[in-house]
Amino acid sequence: MKLIIAEKPSVAKSIASTLGVKSGADGSFQGNGYIVSWCVGHLVSPMDAAGYNENFKKWRYDDLPILPEPFRYVIAPGKEAAFENLRTLMNRPDVDTVVNACDAGREGELIFRLVYEMTGCKKPIERLWISSMEDSAIREGMNDLRPGAEYDALYQSALCRQKADWLVGINATRLFSVLYHRTLNVGRVQTPTLAMLAEREAKTMMFRKEKYHHVRLKVNGAEAVSEKIISPEDAEKVKAACTDRSAVCVSVKREQKKEQPPKLYDLTTLQREANRIFGYTAKQTLDYAQSLYEKKLLTYPRTDSRYLTSDMAETASCVIHLAAKVPPFDKCSSFYPLVELMVSDKDVTDHHAIIPTMETEKADISALPVGERNLFLLVCCRLLCASAEPFHYETVTATFECGGHTFTAKGKHILSEGWREIERIFRSSLKDKPEDEDGGADLPELMEGETYDNVSAEITEHYTQPPKPFTEDTLLSAMENAGKADMPDEAERKGLGTPATRAAIIEKLVSAGFVERKGKNLIPTKAGMNLVTVLPEPLTSPMLTAEWEQRLTSIARGEADPGEFLNGICAMVKDTVSTYSHISEEGQKLFAPDKEVIGNCPRCGKPVYEGKSNFACSDRSCSFVLWKNDRFWTSRKKELTKKMAADLLKKGRTAVKGMWSEKKGDTYDATVVMEDTGGRFINFKLEFPKRKDGANGRK
């Protein structure tokens, strides 16, 4: 009997249904020669540092670096029952083979293998590797199960990725948190990503806008524009030289161009487009795509390929015709799909591009949740566009001379919309339409050598623009292309992270307080900027991290040694710990909490801040401090408040009501006067208001 282990219950249910396994028991489906169960994500995770040594519970510099050998693993908290269920099923005597049906990728391989290793199972492994949850794909995959050993290198790559993240994360986070007395989460991939955001923000902050001008002529219904003019006086001179004068068209250049159809989506380009059009975060897009995959409507989403394999051509043609019937695409002109444009076997590694499935024919798309529906239609749109004719257009550039100056008018004339018609119809169906990026309009008929009299001229003011903040669209692009210029063209993987992990990296930066969302923009916080400032270059370098990602890909292909990779990570960690044993006073100030000034120190004049238990001088060499739990206050059942401390610092006294007298068993009001003798502790004395004279002359 085969035991099939999926990554989550919904996938297990689909596999069981396809294989005719009807009977459901606790934690599995059984029947027809199969047991189908699931992992519920990561059931096994690396042990925390404290698991290796009780002393590691406290974060101390002297314990670093922490380099486990060997790495040990534990069952993820709260998932003990799920793990025990799989252990029991693996140990059943009637189970002779275990099928890994977790997601067909690096992380899915890791999820299964760690469970398999921890249970101590020695039974043969087979691999179900599919790119769609359609019944036909599952049946085909089950008929072509691969030996588990074929994916050993992929597992080693996944282990190296996990260990590298642990080594860098645990050591660098502890190191810089101890040095700066604040939890500073440092990650192998998230920190270089933060560095890119910080660099962009720094350029924006340093930017100083500059004014410039254009002179614009109205010529026979066309607008011709001068070159950039810095000086307003010069712009006025150009305007004066042209107003009511004649302009001569000295050249008209026409050029026919074509824009090829866009490629199909991989996960990163899908996330970018969904962010640009719908404002979805990378995580939202991945979640929607994963749900559509599990509903059998989209193919496997965590792919980095934008092509299909040649054996998919017939299926793709069928899916294209189905997608063309889905509103609003049913309004598009009919066309003969060019499937060959989307096929390239050499450009497909683990999984092909994301496309709809044959289930499109039976599905009620209108019943999908709005986020999933939008994403599904976006993928349909891209499939249709990718198989359509090119977009043909003509550009026109007309050059004029007037008053001794040159002006240019540009226009565009559409010859054949091709794939752009499909995109236009889809965009027009959206309630929130994105900005039109085409630019350029038809120019009136213009002839070289023709003179146009009495032209009008006007000056327009413009300002240079700062670098635009990153959006998830542009950040995903930057992550994907990090280090690209420094890697050989044949390198299969470039960039920070993988399509499957980039969304989580962005979310970690936001949840850690290093990045915040402002509309569509991602802006580093003050803490994020400061963190990048204090970290060493190996931890913030996008290029170095991209090289590591390339090494991991080489390990997955059996072309690099896992041990060498981890030795390099360990060496970098050791070097970082030894180099950063202390920090400057200026560095300490970067992460000092924002404090309110209560007053000025009576001894040295420096600001006094409120702490958890006191009000202390900001100058460490000055010993002035007012303790909130001073016995003077606690014996009178009062606490030194911020207002009272401010009065003492400003006036040397504060009025206090309701102080307790142990002797009389009652409360009283008095003025507390501060007597600072310059010692370690501050003394106080009480002053009582004088009573008015009574009738008998006594006070």
Regions found by a protein language model. Give the residues of each.
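Conserved short loop/turn motifs at secondary-structure junctions
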Residues: M1, V99-A104, H181-T183, R254-K263, ...
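Intrinsically disordered, low-complexity regulatory segments
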Residues: M1-Q162, W166, P337, P466
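Basic, low-complexity terminal or inter-domain segments flanking catalytic cores
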Residues: K2-L3, K79, M90, T173, ...
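Amphipathic alpha-helical transducer elements in NTP-driven molecular machines
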Residues: P9-A16, G33-V36, V40, A76-R87, ...
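C-terminal or mid-to-C-terminal helical accessory/interaction module adjacent to the motor/catalytic core
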Residues: F71, P93, D135-L217, R254-K258
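Metal- or metallocofactor-binding catalytic centers and their adjacent structured scaffolds
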Residues: A149, P232-Y265, Q271
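Short polybasic amphipathic segments
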Residues: H213-K218, V396-F400
